Amino acid sequence: AYSGYTSGAKKAVVKSNQATITKMVGSKAALCAVGEAIDYTTFNGTKSTFSCPVSIDNFIKYMNDTIYGLDFKSPYDVAYPSWCKINVTNCSPPGYMSACPSHPDQLGYLSIFKHNNTTIKVCSNLEYTSGKTVYIENLISFE
């Protein structure tokens, strides 16, 4: 029973991280669409600002830097030291993922990447069950 509770609690953290990060990226994308300056966190944890408009690729990099800099981590054990943050497969310099985190050991990991020229995808690895990875995915419009 305890392991079931722990498993449920870890999944709840993954869902919470996905929701929090999706809301943050979505709100910053909306502000960017109207030309606002955007506050973000650099990968080393310092606060900074960028001016809009920016390319979708640069916006995604700023968002990935923010997730890394805010020190989000997976609630699961980290399989490899290079996977030091929720959104990287290389710790230093940060190696951000360009697709959903598909490795079975990437439970709780999240990626932010370009879905197409006007859409950003936020994707979390919720669980690995019956030989398949289960994802939580959200799309964010980027104008």
Predicted regions and their residues:
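Periplasmic/extracellular, small/polar-rich flexible segments of pilin-like filament-forming proteins
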Residues: 30-143
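N-terminal alpha-helical signal peptides/signal-anchor transmembrane segments
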Residues: 17-36
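Amphipathic alpha-helical segments typified by the pilin-like N-terminal helix
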Residues: 1-22
